[in-house]
Curated annotation (Swiss-Prot):
It is an enzyme of class 4 (lyase). This is Fumarate hydratase, mitochondrial. The gene is fum1. The keyword Nucleotide-binding does not apply. It is found in: Mitochondrion matrix; Cytoplasm; Nucleus.
């Protein structure tokens, strides 16, 4: 068996409201960096196949509905095969996300370890743990073919994992696949469990792991890059814009400081929502009462999952809520939705400020990564901004779906679980990928267009605001309107209209003094 990653030290990095969510050392699955377990991770080239299993051949499996033929080269069983036949919806692209499959491996391994303490034959527990570890490692990925659109509790996918792990454990012990001896998918792999508590548990495990290992690092990467630009641009004075019209000046660094703060708040929002995702439903079984499990099973499973992942999970204090409602998923999706709003604003600003190169705002020079047009030679487009804003739109759509799904719990069970899992993992993956791409291929390469910035600052009529304390609002408005009408400068009209001398204008209208409050 693969060794368990034991915890030697523990450092709390996330805590809100007294609830648990600590990352213990570096998140791993028994020593494997979890970065390899992203939804887009390439699966290993050494997939396991049953001994003697040949493509095109079948073996007979059975469930309570009777016998059914299953491909001989696959480890799944009767219930998985029936689901394949009954839910032909969407094809391979709608399969359960791989992070969820790997989370099933984590949970089934943890459950087998704990069940050993409650009477499961140690020999069977060892074989189940070994098979579950192979699920974690990705060696059984192609044995999880089911689509998201199935029973709303995720029963088919839970049984898919039970059957695959059971058959692999049978093979490890020298038995016959499909015999359910000596390892039974329900009696042994699913011991002390129900799909109703198992699926929400793996939803949380998968989401937390992906957030810790992909999304948060990507957002921090973006935050650092924007912070660097804030510092780099702090002495560049430019014109501000409100309502897409000229406004008073600010520094380019100040403008970027807004972006830095938005991303920083986004990271805080994730951290604040994480503790509820670190609460596991396991132990509630069918309706939250814990029927057919053991006292303390829920706590021990959470502890075991924590050791396997190096992230602190706790058992949910109320299993009825954990099965019937998935507010923690909706809450996290809400945080991701806010982040999508922030990133769309940032990307649109950068795209607009970089518009041109000759007929736009032209205050930023964006990296040229690829040709932009199949018909217009030399054209370069703000492609990273466009990609990021499309991701943001998708995340907003995912949140709408999650909102409906989260509101659709009925009595003791929410029956939109697979859809919730698919969309939250999609949002996490997309935002993480997009933040990395936007940072590496756009933000770090942004340069100021000094000429364009200076021209806009010089020509802006809103510099007249600096004259307010000296000649009053109405007179300032008259200067601005006259300058616009005559296509002249503020300074010319200030003098021509008799409000002061050129020297007074130069003394009072100084953009570098207009970017902060007056000192008293």
């Amino acid at each position: 068996m693969a060794s368990v990653a034991h915890i030697s030290t523990a450092k709390a990095i996330f805590r809100a409201g007294g609830l648990p969510c600590r990352r213990l050392i570096t998140p791993t699955l028994t020593g494997l960096p979890l970065k390899t377990h992203r939804m887009n991770s390439t699966t290993p080239t050494y997939h396991l196949i049953p001994k003697g299993g040949k493509h095109g051949e079948f073996r007979q499996e059975s469930d309570t509905f009777g016998p059914i033929q299953v491909p001989a080269e696959k480890y799944w069983g009767a219930q998985t095969q029936r689901s394949l036949q009954n839910f032909r919806i969407g094809g391979e692209k709608e399969r359960l996300p791989l992070p969820l499959v790997r989370a099933f491996g984590v949970l089934k391994r943890a459950a087998a370890s704990v069940n050993r303490e409650f009477g499961l034959d140690p020999k069977l527990a060892d074989a189940i743990e070994q098979a579950a570890q192979e699920v974690i490692d990705g060696r059984l990925d192609d044995n999880f073919p089911l689509v998201v659109f199935q029973t709303g509790s995720g029963t088919q996918s839970n049984m898919n994992s039970n059957e695959v792990i059971a058959n692999r454990a049978i093979e490890i012990l020298g038995g016959t696949l499909g015999s359910k001896k000596p390892v039974h998918p329900n009696d042994h792999v699913n011991m002390s469990q129900s799909s109703n508590d198992t699926f929400p548990t793996v939803m949380h495990i998968a989401s937390v792991l992906q957030i810790h290992t992909h999304l948060l690092p990507a957002m921090k990467h973006l935050h650092r890059a924007l912070k660097g630009k804030e510092e780099e641009f702090k002495n560049i004075i430019k014109i501000g814009r409100t309502h897409m019209q000229d406004a008073t000046p600010l520094s380019l660094g100040q403008e970027f400081s807004g972006y830095v703060t938005q991303v920083g708040y986004g990271i805080e929002r994730i951290n604040n929502a994480l503790p509820r995702l670190c609460l596991l439903a396991q132990g509630g079984t069918a309706v939250g009462t814990g029927l057919n499990t053991f006292e303390g099973f829920d706590v021990k499973v959470a502890e075991k999952v924590s050791k396997l992942t190096n992230i602190e999970f706790k058992t949910a204090p109320n299993k009825f809520e954990a099965l019937a409602a998935h507010d923690a998923i909706v809450e996290m999706s809400g945080a991701l939705n806010v982040i999508a709003c922030s990133l769309m604003k940032i990307a649109n600003d950068i795209r607009q400020l970089g518009s041109g190169p000759r007929c736009g705002l032209g205050e930023l020079i964006l990296p040229a990564n690829e040709p932009g047009s199949s018909i217009m030679p030399g054209k370069v487009n703000p492609t990273q901004c466009e990609a990021l804003t499309m991701v943001c739109a998708q995340v907003m759509g995912n949140h709408a779906t999650i909102t409906v799904a989260g509101a659709s719990g009925h009595c003791e069970l929410n029956v939109f679980k697979p859809l919730l899992a698919k969309n939250i993992l999609s949002s996490i993956r997309l935002l993480g990928d997009a933040c990395e791409s936007f940072t590496d291929h756009c933000v770090v390469g942004i340069e100021p267009n000094y000429e364009g910035i200076a021209r806009h600052l010089r020509d802006s009529l809103m510099l007249v605001t600096a004259l307010n304390p000296h000649i009053g609002y109405d007179n300032c408005a008259k200067i601005a309107k006259t300058a616009l009408k005559n296509k002249s400068t503020l300074k010319h009209e200030f003098v021509t209209l008799g409000f002061g001398t050129p020297e007074q204008f130069d003394e009072w209208v100084r953009p570098e003094l207009m970017i902060s409050a007056k000192k008293v």
